Amino acid sequence: MANPITCDEILFERHPMLSSLARFCVRRRRIVVFGIWIPLFFIVAVVSGAMKGDFRTDFVLPSSESREVQELLEKANPNKAGFSATVVFKGDAVLNTPGLKDAMASFLNQVGAIDGVDTMSPYDNPQQVSQSGNIAFARLDISNRSQAEGITFSDEVQEIGVATLTNVSGVQVEYGGEIFVKFTVPESEALGILAAIVILVLAFGSVLAMGLPIGTALLGLGIAVSTVTILSHATLMPDFTTSMVAMVGLGVGIDYALFIVTRYREGLQAGMSVEKAVVDAVDTSGRAVLFAGVTVIISLLGLYVMGLSFVRGLATGAAIGVLVMMLASVTLLPALLGMVKHRIDVTTRAAIAALIVLVLSALAAIIFHSLPVLLLGLVGAVAITALSFVFRSLRTPIPVRVTKARELTFWFRWSRFVQRRPWTALISSASVLVLLSIPLFSIRLGFGDTGNQPEETTVRQAYDLLAEGFGPGVNGPLFVTVQGDTAASPEKLMAFAGALSQAENVAFATPSPLSATGPSTEIDGQPLALVVVYPKSSPQEKETSQLVHTLRDDIIPATGITAKVGGFTAASVDFADYIGGRLPYLIGAVLILSFLLLMAVF
């Protein structure tokens, strides 16, 4: 009777296409590296740098009350349908500070002259002054802008502030709102790369064996991020897409390259030639890389079933990142392996010393936010490398670590343990998975706000000052659109705002003019007005979500007035409800597509 074919034999079956591709990459390694990948990197980097990104975070549901509010405000006054921002002032009896009134008037006049901006001064609205009188805020309503336009606007407003407000002594000025958030390179990704470098060097005992996966992933990441930046002009992508690409791309890029490098080193240790070892690595581990990559891409594209435009853009960007990493792993990496040949296991004293200097300087640069420290480390690493050409001792190879026989390794013995006691392994692992899944049943979905920013940033300080003076809810106002006779009557509108102010968890509510001529405007033949409601709880608290539902389901219907609750905070509540309802469809789509892929492969 013939022996059955195992899954390993199917997965690692020799594939003529992969074999031919690997052989081409080894034999034409200079063309692959210097004629394809590196030029591609510079081309997309230059193009993306010239075009800039056109990322737009369009948090609009297909059908929701917050969407209806958004559409009404866009018709009435597009500035009210975009970003809400604040300029916060703190000082003793701040509005009585000599010179502040004139300086603030000059500031708001110049900011209000910018296209698509409405301003409201605390001198015109007492509710924008804290009870202590020490904190006040000016409100800015800004029309929707792309990420690049938002950065330009933020810089322009703060430049106006420097010119008009800094001469007023005794007053602290901070700028709050998402539009003033400055993009910084996430420290987590940089720390992750440093951790990967240290772990891989310890695991492989070789700088080159570590450097190839890291280098391949970084080059692929640069191409992926630049490509996504270019594509943001063709399809809607949120402004955090590049962070998602970096997070997913680095993870899979290093992982996929590790598969192939490990198999290549095993081939060399088995006595294969360089070309044969590369071909064998791509034939086996490369096939696993393609299978794993396609599975991840399918899972990401499963996000399309959510039916949200910004989620589709996010999924597309992350899928592009994974695709680039897959291609780099089976083309660029084999070419690099063909270049280093047997030197992949050779590490000199100079290489280790240069790596230590570089890692420590990079860590210090991240901790102290100092680019000169990183540059100093780079200079030190280059100097050590240069000195190795003068001092022979620096070129001395570090003894190669003795590799244990396969049967003596921990993972070999672990696999045998699992095979001998399958039920023990199954029950134990299933129990751990169940325990880890318990928090899922109490998860609350939503969006972060500027309260999550670092404490030293102006947006976080503005957030904290507003929370100190008015309560945390002032950082997440609710926009209530009012239609009908109430909108046309200032007295009735004030009475309605007063009724909303009496609701539990409402700090205060105030009408907000929709036009320069008065508090209301006419849309489709019907008066429309806006009331801004400030909760007592912060935007991310459960009580704020409950307030949105209470206003919609109980308080507003009881008044008999036609009004709808929207704004960013209400939209985040709608998103949480919508996404929670769509999660089963997402999970089902991913499982079905993955099952079909497994059926096709096996």
Model-predicted regions and their roles:
Residues 63-84, 91-175, 447-602:
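Structured non-transmembrane domains adjacent to transmembrane bundles in polytopic membrane proteins
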